[in-house]
Amino acid sequence: MVTIRLSRGGAKKRPFYQIVVADSRSPRDGRFIERVGFFNPIAQGNAERLRINLERVNHWVAQGASLSDRVASLVKEAQKAA
């Protein structure tokens, strides 16, 4: 099953997440099919906090991909801002 979920990057105590389309059997930070955005939970100043390619997310959902709970809330936030 294909899932759209967060993949953690960044340094210790400074998380940075890639929003990726991945097989649900793959490790959290492992192999993925496509990167569709990023999320920076500790963005400060004029740094960009969230960027999602909604067109690609909608494409993958139409193909049967499921969204993780956190990504679903981020997509809703991005749609509201757009």
Curated annotation (Swiss-Prot):
PROSITE patterns: RIBOSOMAL_S16. SUPFAM superfamilies: Ribosomal protein S16 (SSF54565). It comes from the Bacteria. GO terms for biological process: translation. GO terms for cellular component: cytoplasm; small ribosomal subunit. One of its GO terms (molecular function) is structural constituent of ribosome. Keywords: Ribonucleoprotein, Ribosomal protein. PANTHER family: 30S RIBOSOMAL PROTEIN S16, SMALL RIBOSOMAL SUBUNIT PROTEIN BS16M. Belongs to the bacterial ribosomal protein bS16 family. HAMAP family: Ribosomal_bS16. This is Small ribosomal subunit protein bS16. It comes from Haemophilus influenzae (strain ATCC 51907 / DSM 11121 / KW20 / Rd). The gene is rpsP.
